[in-house]
């Protein structure tokens, strides 16, 4: 069941929470004897909205809102069965989205 590579993509709106989760994954993988390439920071996606402050008049009074989505990527090589087992047992915070792909 030995694969060549596992690619993990993490997304979050809070970069501190994201970096903490990446650090936890890297420590777990290194403890099991596998090696990690990364974390690789991916481009941050930004969404912006401009909203009028008043109900119908005063066009010049506007409010700006922005939300940023931070992303990181990890590649795990030299995978062992203990690595896969320990990755499945990791509990990550609620604000972090994780996507795992195995490549053979």
Swiss-Prot record:
A Gene Ontology annotation in the biological process aspect, one of them, is: translation
InterPro entries, A to Z: Ribosomal_uS10 (IPR001848), Ribosomal_uS10_CS (IPR018268), Ribosomal_uS10_dom (IPR027486), Ribosomal_uS10_dom_sf (IPR036838)
User: Per the record, a Pfam family?
Assistant: Ribosomal_S10
The coiled-coil regions, if any, are none
Sorted alphabetically, the keyword list is:
Ribonucleoprotein, Ribosomal protein
Q: Name one GO cellular component term.
A: ribonucleoprotein complex
One GO molecular function term of this record is: structural constituent of ribosome
Role according to the record: Involved in the binding of tRNA to the ribosomes.
Assembly description? Part of the 30S ribosomal subunit.
Q: Which family does it belong to?
A: Belongs to the universal ribosomal protein uS10 family.
- Identification of the protein by name: Small ribosomal subunit protein uS10
